[in-house]
């Protein structure tokens, strides 16, 4: 089972699209996109994604990608 990375379409439009495109190239991740993840406050203040159900943020797409990989390393699924 791969880590699940979920993106909100509104946040993609705010800048996290680049992070999604980078992460989609990793065959060890399941990357999904939803209309809304109901984290509107978080969505307005930063780039974010849900990683296995937990919010991970970043100031830039590159920082978001780095933070996602760090989160996955620090929080193994098994």
UniProtKB/Swiss-Prot annotation:
Family: Belongs to the UPF0349 family.
Top-rank taxon, per record: Bacteria
Source organism of the structure: Bacillus velezensis (strain DSM 23117 / BGSC 10A6 / LMG 26770 / FZB42) (Bacillus amyloliquefaciens subsp. plantarum)
Record-linked Pfam families: DUF1450
InterPro entries noted in UniProt: DUF1450, UPF0349
Listed name of the protein: UPF0349 protein RBAM_029300
